[in-house]
């Protein structure tokens, strides 16, 4: 499975998360995943909450339209985004 795929109006992102980074950024492809740096530490769900907020802002959707499907406790995650209003350049490039 590739880093970015589509199922109807939903986008599926396979992510590799780098917590405690200096800034929030979608870095680009990292193997078969998209690497995303976030400033939040991986403690008590802070990184997941921050990731969802950051991705929601990047795709211009409500946080409620993003589902963390896999990887709640690890760096490798899978997100489903329902009907994004905007596609960030790094994500569009990964889609090909």
Swiss-Prot record:
A matching Pfam family: DUF167
Q: Name one GO cellular component term.
A: cytoplasm
**Which domain of life does this protein belong to?**
Bacteria
Family according to the record: Belongs to the UPF0235 family.
Query: What protein name does the entry list?
Result: UPF0235 protein NT01EI_0281
According to its UniProt entry, this protein's organism is Edwardsiella ictaluri (strain 93-146)
State the taxonomy lineage.
Bacteria, Pseudomonadati, Pseudomonadota, Gammaproteobacteria, Enterobacterales
């Amino acid at each position: 499975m590739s880093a970015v795929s589509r199922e109807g109006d939903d986008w599926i992102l396979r992510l590799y998360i780098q917590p405690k980074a200096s800034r929030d950024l979608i870095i680009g492809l990292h193997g078969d995943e998209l690497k995303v740096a976030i400033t939040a530490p991986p403690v008590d769900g802070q990184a997941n909450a921050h990731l969802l907020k950051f991705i929601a802002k990047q795709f211009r959707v409500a946080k409620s339209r993003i589902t963390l499907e896999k990887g709640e406790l690890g760096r490798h995650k899978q997100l489903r985004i329902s009907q994004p209003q905007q596609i960030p350049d790094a994500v569009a490039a990964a889609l090909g």
